[in-house]
UniProtKB/Swiss-Prot annotation:
Chain positions covered by the region annotation Interaction with U4 snRNA: 13-15
Family statement: Belongs to the WD repeat gemin-5 family.
Role played: The SMN complex catalyzes the assembly of small nuclear ribonucleoproteins (snRNPs), the building blocks of the spliceosome, and thereby plays an important role in the splicing of cellular pre-mRNAs. Most spliceosomal snRNPs contain a common set of Sm proteins SNRPB, SNRPD1, SNRPD2, SNRPD3, SNRPE, SNRPF and SNRPG that assemble in a heptameric protein ring on the Sm site of the small nuclear RNA to form the core snRNP (Sm core).
Organism: Homo sapiens (Human)
Gene name, Swiss-Prot/TrEMBL: GEMIN5
Free-text domain note: The WD repeat domain mediates binding to U1 snRNA and to U4 snRNA. The WD repeat domain also mediates binding to the 7-methylguanosine cap that is found both on mRNA and snRNA molecules. The regions that bind snRNA molecules and the isolated 7-methylguanosine cap overlap at least partially. Besides, the WD repeat domain mediates interaction with the 60S large ribosomal subunit.
Complex formation: Part of the core SMN complex that contains SMN1, GEMIN2/SIP1, DDX20/GEMIN3, GEMIN4, GEMIN5, GEMIN6, GEMIN7, GEMIN8 and STRAP/UNRIP. Part of the SMN-Sm complex that contains SMN1, GEMIN2/SIP1, DDX20/GEMIN3, GEMIN4, GEMIN5, GEMIN6, GEMIN7, GEMIN8, STRAP/UNRIP and the Sm proteins SNRPB, SNRPD1, SNRPD2, SNRPD3, SNRPE, SNRPF and SNRPG. Interacts with GEMIN2; the interaction is direct. Interacts with SMN1, SNRPB, SNRPD1, SNRPD2, SNRPD3 and SNRPE; the interaction is direct. Interacts with cytosolic DDX20/GEMIN3 and GEMIN4. Interacts with SNRNP70 and HNRNPU.
Phenotype upon changing D1019E: In NEDCAM; uncertain significance
Protein's name in the database: Gem-associated protein 5
Lineage: Eukaryota, Metazoa, Chordata, Craniata, Vertebrata
Keywords: Coiled coil, Cytoplasm, Disease variant, Isopeptide bond, mRNA processing, mRNA splicing, Nucleus, Phosphoprotein, Protein biosynthesis, Repeat, RNA-binding, Translation regulation, Ubl conjugation, WD repeat
Residues the record lists as Phosphothreonine modifications: T51, T751
Length: 1508
């Protein structure tokens, strides 16, 4: 694949009449989501011959909702202008060259459905909305015209290419009208014939109706197509043909001169190879048209399944059509086509571009009707990226539209060679992982918990694991099988198992040979192997080291656990992150240094990336787990959560990270330096992957539906953009809602809150739940809710154009609101009458027998008749049919006749109560009958059980009462009265059911109260309640209450861990104390140390010591913190610290006199009772096992001082034990640490405090014998002299400044690049005057320099170590060769890029200009190096340097040594100022060293200056 950025853009929007367009010259644009993407097509677009000539060149960003229409200006000279319409209610005019908005309007009050730029008027844009309103907008004069033609939904409109005032409009119901905008939208023709949506309108490219020989004698159906009856028709001069495409499966050709249809083309059903016709195909039909300007007798249309047809209009009686790409299988779209637009390239080639539901943009050659190229696109978030280690260049992309893409990034013929895999997926693809050794085997995970395997080289559906995760699959990883899968024989089990981590916190091990079998939860193995009794943390990430021996698990609490095969023994826990771990990545194993493979990078919901070096832990394999609280490297710069990290396979220690801040950052992890920052995405980055072949190429995916291929060498920024930290934003979000619950209690605020939730989040969630469907809803994924805080403040009013007015619930004394024309008017209500409560109480109760009562209030005649009927019924011996009918008709007489009639009256009265909504009265009547069981059954069926009915249920029997209580409990659950339902279940002794009911509905507090009161203390249900509630509280951030739950469940370890999640000093101290109380000593010690480190950052020395005092094993750390406090006070008194602060120091009586070491030991003796050699030895052993990473220039000052004081503490302890070898090594580690960090001042203070009289004292203690510390002592003495050398030099050049900032900056400059300080040496040496002392320097100083200077200069001879000079020269040679190789690769890539971008027309001159700097830079590089830049020569130099380095003894290589050549240059520079001060022997030795070992780029120029 060429060296040029690439983009997989979002899918073009669906179901829009005009969402893509193109202009002559090769510029094509299409609307995707809220943006418009621009594609350059034709010669010059491809970067090299033979590649598809198209390239995504930009994006128009400005709309806040879906873009519903897009059109270019087709007027010469205006091809750079285009117009867009959006669901946000605006129409914008853009300049595509600057990608900015020229002007816009928001005239529409309803959703805009389509727009078109008039081909006849340069500044006219016509748009229509779903309510039938048309706006004509002339942007040059900022004028507009409002037209309301029909009260129907507009689907499409097209301006006439022949008459500037004519516009054809298609409606949803099939009506087509032609209007004249110059006559206020007068309807010229109303064309009837279609009976469904009009999808497309195309004017004939030629005026008049003589271009087509259409038979005027049409079918009877054609004869019925006439003009509207009530509209006066105005014939159009010369007339013109118009084509319309409709959902009714027909294309109609209309005559504008006669206002009637002249031709009908019915879409054919085209059978696909190997399949039948889908019966629902009509429901998915979209019929779009294109009438070619150079072929007016041809018409192009879409068809049912994505095929394109070219109709021959000259043979209308035969309905002849030609199928696009008829000879090639698989070239057509696989689903319906939405838009067609023509494009004429710079070489006059006629192309046709189509967008489809299959998410492909295809380009067709009109001459051959064959597909020229395809641009794939994405219909969802790009969740995951994975390169295959077997099929190099195959990039798998997991997308939220339910499809997996496999991009062959090495394809020569097609730069966008992408295959889609969708069978069996049916959900968002959130995780991907290629098999390390099996070709084409791709594992995938989805957001519904599915795990499967795809064979990308076959058409078979994927294998799906029978074990699903309960939530989203976060990560997939291939690793060696562990028990029980690994217990089988060699041929009975796979060599690699598939591990999946789900959102519920479980890691499953799947057997790829038998996915139908049950997957194993590795938590069980972890518990058994490590004898863990506490609750395991929720896992969020899994990563295997490349050698398959170590597994890392990231957890929700921010911890990372390191396990060792075969039984997953826990060897290490990293307590660094404080939030959920999102990503873990191990360094590759083919680096130049083997120890780099032990580097592990991790990112979490915090914005900081930590790199840990686990070499010591893995190689030692400790018996008990080690806790790591200090990172090897810290990479700070992102401002939001880290979602993905990936190591470069081409470099040592180079890392790329993706973040929610919208950028991808490349780091030099070893030096903690940001290198370059990519800002091409428009959303939050979700994944990133380094190209396996190109060291300059990185791929990244985001929630903007894009995957970008970008080059590190082309980025303008080096670090992420500045912004508010995510921690600050989180604090604001947590602090704002605290007052809201109080407001919600007011009844007047309930209605607005509910409306807001329905309009916002619930609508998004409904879209999300709709899943991957075919109507384009999946383009708006639910995760976009999280982006709301990132949008501009002015966005919210634009989204909701009409304010929602919520009427509050008002009381009798409140004023009611009346809305008139969006204005709120307050109307006063009349004051209520006095004593309303008294009136309510006097209200008469509702009658139980209202029907019979009303019948007793009829007329006198009817009442008399009742009496006669009643008498006849009571006293007649035999009732005839007439009397029975009269009694039955007069049911109210049941009160006076027999029981059967009374029952009938009660039934009728009861039905009346039910119909009127008074079930309680019906129940009373049924109780009067004595049918209590029937009442209960009826009330239960209707959900109308009450407390009274349930209370009376025992009268119907014990079993009836049990049944009634259960039915009432179910009814209460439907009414969300769970607590009351649980109380009723308790009344029938169903305690477990009541507890489960409350637990399942998150009433944990009530459930625990019931369980604690009614169940046995050892009942497992109670513990499960505590753990479930604790998990919920922990997830919501209520750590203290969660800790109580874990304590209640006797999970004290988990209680301490959850308390520590907050990360502040108070929480850590409480957690440490809790762990100490419950006997978790190791956890208590680690938490106490973390607490002390937090207090150290706040300069709270007293609190830090109190925290360390919690655990006896931290005695050594107390000594370190004590020494650190004394040293910090010492530096502050000297004003050497970075700034004075109100530090809470201890009131230790140390005094200011005496050596610093004696003061330290005095405090240790008085405060910590440290006096005997045994105590010193014990403290030394505790501290010796703690290893800190080496320092860099970016190491924070507090952390640097802590690490230095740790080494100094070991040195002091060694001195007290008379172990001088250990003392020397510890002192040297402290000095080297300050040297590596560039803190020259700290290094000098270490010497002044611990070696005030130099190294002679240590030399005497070591003696003359050769000990293991002898090389270390020589290095320590050399660094001491190195510092004295610079102090001596600065004292000569000017009075020594007091500012430590200047001193430190000067040292850093020299230690990195001595040439920057020595550039003036050549000029100073050639001029004799400059060699003399400064004129204003006093003569006494000259005498002092002469007497004392020579004696001091003679001591600097110890710095002239030829062994170290040779070693350092070899190291510089290796570094320079590696840098030169990297530069060669970069230059080659740039040259290729220059050539590719200069292939277009009129770019020959820029190509030459682009090549000239490259050639000049290369020649300049050759001049500086005086050697050819050939690969064999570089390889030879690298081999020789490595061989020389291998010959040096380990004692020389083990301990750092000051740069020998740098010291030589400083001494020679001093000589240039003071010629007589340096002995001839030293001068000659320095020059010889420079001549012999100064052949590298760093020192070559200065060697020529001083050695001539």
């Amino acid at each position: 694949m060429g060296q040029e950025p690439r983009t997989l853009p979002p899918s073009p929007n669906w179901y829009c009449a005009r969402c893509s367009d193109a202009v002559p010259g090769g510029l094509f644009g299409f609307a995707a989501r809220t943006s418009v993407f621009l594609v350059r097509v034709g010669p010059g677009a491809g970067e090299s011959p033979g590649t598809p000539p198209f390239r995504v060149i930009g994006e128009l960003v400005g709309h806040t909702e879906r873009v519903s229409g897009f059109t270019f200006s087709h007027h010469p000279g205006q091809y750079n202008l285009c117009a867009t319409s959006s669901d946000d209610g605006t129409v914008k005019i853009w300049d595509v060259e600057t990608k900015t908005v020229v002007t816009e309007h928001a005239l529409h009050q309803h959703t805009i459905s389509t727009l078109h730029w008039s081909p006849r008027v340069k500044d006219l844009i016509v748009s229509g909305d779903e309510k039938g309103v048309v706006f004509c907008y002339w942007f040059n004069r900022n004028d507009s015209q409002h037209l309301f033609i029909e009260p129907r939904t507009i689907f499409c409109l097209t301006c006439s290419p022949h008459h500037e005032d004519l516009v054809a409009i298609g409606y949803k119901d099939g009506i087509v009208v032609i209007i004249d905008i110059s006559k206020k939208g007068e309807v010229i023709h109303r064309l009837r014939g279609h009976d469904d949506e009009i999808h497309s309108i195309a004017w004939c490219p030629l005026p008049g109706e003589d271009c087509l020989s259409i038979n005027q004698e049409e079918t009877s159906e054609e004869a019925e197509i006439t003009n509207g009856n009530a509209v006066a028709q105005a014939p159009v001069t010369k007339g013109c043909y118009l084509a319309t495409g409709s959902k009714d499966q027909t294309i109609r050709i209309w005559s504008c001169s006669r206002g009637r249809g002249v031709m009908i083309l019915k879409l054919p059903f085209l059978k696909r190879r190997g399949g039948g016709i889908d019966p629902t195909v009509k429901e998915r039909l979209w019929l779009t048209l294109h009438w070619p300007s150079n072929q007016p007798t041809q018409l192009v249309s879409s068809c049912f399944g994505g095929e394109l047809l070219q109709w021959d209009l000259t043979q209308s009686w035969r309905r002849k059509y030609t199928l696009f790409s008829a000879s090639s299988e698989g070239q057509n779209h696989s689903r319906i086509v939405f838009n067609l637009c023509p494009l004429q390239t710079e070489d006059d080639k006629q192309l046709l571009l189509s967008t489809s539901m299959d998410r492909d943009v295809k380009c067709w050659d009109i001459a051959t009707l064959e597909c020229s190229w395809t641009l794939p696109s994405l219909g969802g978030f790009a969740y995951s990226l994975a390169f295959s280690s077997v099929d190099i260049g195959s990039l798998a992309i997991g997308v939220g539209d339910g499809m997996i893409r496999v991009w062959n990034t090495l394809s020569i013929k097609n730069n966008y060679d992408v295959k889609n895999f969708w069978q069996g997926v049916k959900s968002k693809v959130t995780a991907l992982c290629w098999h390390p050794t099996k070709e084409g085997c791709l594992a995938f995970g989805t957001d519904d918990g599915k795990v499967g395997l795809y064979d990308t080289y076959s058409n078979k559906p994927p294998q799906i694991s029978s074990t699903y995760h309960k939530k989203t699959v976060y990560t997939l990883a291939w690793g060696p099988p562990v028990p029980p899968m690994s217990l089988g024989g060699e041929g009975d089990r796979p060599s690699l198992a598939l591990y999946s981590c789900g959102g519920e916190g479980i890691v499953l091990q799947h057997n790829p040979w038998k996915l139908s079998g049950e997957a194993f939860d590795i938590n069980k193995l972890i518990r058994d192997t490590n004898s863990i009794k506490y609750k395991l943390p929720v896992h969020t990430e899994i990563s295997w080291k490349a050698d398959g021996k170590i597994m890392a698990l990231g957890n929700e609490d921010g911890s990372i656990e390191i396990f060792q095969i075969p039984n997953l023994k826990l060897i290490c826990t990293i307590q660094q992150h404080h939030k959920l771990v999102n990503t873990i990545s191990w360094h590759h194993e083919h680096g130049s240094q083997p120890e780099l493979s032990y580097l592990m990078a991790s990112g979490s919901n915090n914005a900081v990336i930590y790199v840990h070096n686990l070499k010591t832990v893995i190689e030692s394999s400790p018996e008990s787990p080690v806790t790591i609280t200090e990172p090897y490297r810290t990479l700070s710069g992102h401002t939001a959560k880290i979602t993905s990290v990936a190591w470069s396979p081409h470099h040592d220690g180079r890392l790329v990270s993706a973040s929610y801040d919208g950028t991808a950052q490349v780091w030099d992890a070893l030096r903690e330096e940001p290198l370059c920052n990519f800002r091409g995405h428009r959303g939050r980055l979700l994944c990133v992957a380094w190209s396996p072949l190109d060291p300059d190429c990185i791929y990244s995916g985001a929630d903007d539906f894009c995957v970008h291929k970008w080059l590190t060498s082309m980025q303008d920024h080096s670090r992420p953009p500045q912004g508010k930290k995510s921690i600050e934003l989180e604090k604001k979000r947590l602090s704002q809602p605290k007052a809201k619950p109080k407001k919600k209690k007011k009844p007047t605020l309930r209605t607005p809150v509910k409306l807001e939730s329905i309009d916002g989040n619930e609508e998004e969630s409904m879209k999300e739940n709709s899943g991957p469907v075919e109507n384009g809803v999946s383009d708006q994924e639910g995760e976009e809710q999280a982006r709301e805080p990132e949008l501009p403040c002015g966005l919210a009013p634009a989204v909701s154009r009409e304010p929602v007015i919520c009427t509050p619930v008002s009381s009798g004394f409140e004023k009611s609101k009346v809305t008139i024309n969006n204005k709120v008017i307050l109307l006063k209500k009349e004051p209520p009458k006095e004593k309303p409560e008294t009136l309510i109480k006097k209200r008469k109760a509702r009658s139980l027998l209202p029907l019979s009562t009303s019948l007793d209030h009829r007329s006198k005649e009817e009442l008399h008749q009742d009496c006669l009927v009643l008498a006849t019924a009571k006293h007649s011996r035999e009732l005839n049919e007439d009397v029975s009918a009269d009694v039955e008709e007069r049911f109210h007489l049941g009160l006076f006749t027999d029981r059967a009639t009374l029952y009938r009256m009660i039934d009728i009265e009861g039905k009346g109560h039910l119909e009127n909504g008074h079930p309680e009265l019906f129940h009373q009547l049924m109780l009067w009958k004595g049918d209590l069981k029937g009442v209960l059954q009826t009330a239960a069926e209707r959900g109308e059980l009450t407390d009274n009915l349930v209370a009376m249920a025992p009268a119907a029997g014990y079993h009836v009462w049990l049944w009634a209580v259960e039915a009432f409990a179910k009814q209460l659950c439907f009414q969300d009265q769970y607590v009351k339902a649980a109380s009723h279940l308790l009344s029938i002794h169903k305690v477990y059911e009541a507890v489960e009911l409350l637990k399942s509905n998150h009433f944990y507090r009530e459930a625990i109260a019931i369980a604690k009161a009614r169940l046995r203390p050892e009942d497992p249900v109670l513990k499960d309640l505590y753990l479930s509630w604790g998990t919920v509280l922990e997830r919501d951030g209520h750590y203290a209450v969660a800790a109580k739950c874990y304590l209640g469940a006797t999970c004290a370890y988990d209680a301490a861990k959850v308390l520590a999640k907050k990360g502040d000093a108070a929480s850590l101290r409480t957690a440490a104390e809790l762990a100490a109380i419950v006997g978790e000593d190791e956890l208590s010690a680690s938490l106490a140390l973390r607490c002390a480190q937090e207090l150290l950052l706040a300069n709270n020395w007293v609190g830090a010591q109190e925290a360390l005092q919690l655990h006896e094993s931290l005695q050594g750390q107390r000594l370190v913190f004590c020494l650190l406090e004394l040293l910090s006070r010492h530096l502050e008194e000297k004003q050497l610290s970075e700034g004075k602060s109100s530090s809470s120091y201890h009131t230790w009586n140390t005094g200011t006199e005496g050596p610093f070491v004696e003061r330290v030991t005095a405090v240790w003796k008085s405060i910590f009772s440290l006096d005997t050699p045994e105590q010193y030895q014990e403290a030394f052993q505790k501290l010796q096992n703690i290893k800190y990473p080496s320092a860099t220039n970016n190491t924070p000052a507090k952390q640097l001082l802590l690490h230095i004081c740790h080494d100094l503490t070991l040195a002091v302890l060694s001195q007290q034990m008379a172990s001088w070898d250990e003392a020397v090594q510890a002192l040297l580690r402290a000095v080297v640490r300050s040297y590596d960090s560039g803190s020259f001042t700290i290094m000098q203070e270490v010497y002044s405090a611990f070696l005030p009289d130099g190294c002679d004292h240590l030399r005497d203690k070591l003696g003359d014998h050769q000990s293991p510390a002898t090389p270390a002592f020589k290095s320590l003495e050399a660094f001491f002299l190195y510092g004295r050398l610079y102090e001596f030099w600065w004292s000569l050049s000017r009075p020594c400044p007091n500012s430590s900032v200047w001193v430190r900056a000067g040292h850093r400059t020299l230690s990195v690049e001595p040439s920057q300080q020595l550039d003036t040496a050549s000029t100073e040496e050639t001029d004799p005057e400059t060699s003399q002392p400064e004129p204003n320097r006093p003569s006494e100083l000259d005498l002092r320099l002469t007497e004392e200077g020579e004696r001091m200069l003679s001591t600097f001879k110890e710095l002239f170590s030829e062994k170290h000079a040779s070693l350092q020269n070899s190291q510089r040679t290796v570094a320079e060769v590696q840098e030169t190789l990297a530069e060669m690769i970069r230059q080659h890539q740039k040259s290729q890029l220059c050539k590719s971008t200069a292939n277009g027309p009129d770019k020959n001159e820029p190509e030459v200009e682009a090549e000239q700097p490259l050639c000049s830079s290369q020649s300049q590089c050759k001049e500086e190096k005086n050697e050819p830049l050939s690969l064999p020569e570089l390889t030879k130099r690298l081999t020789e340097a490595n061989q020389r380095m291998a010959k040096f003894p380990e004692s020389i290589k083990a301990w750092p040594f000051p740069d020998v050549l740098e010291c030589c240059l400083v001494l020679l520079l001093i000589r240039s100022h003071f010629p007589g001060c340096l002995a001839q022997e030293m001068q000659q030795q320095a020059q010889e060293l420079l001549q012999k070992y100064g052949n590298t780029k760093t020192y070559r120029r200065h060697c020529q200056t001083f050695c001539m």
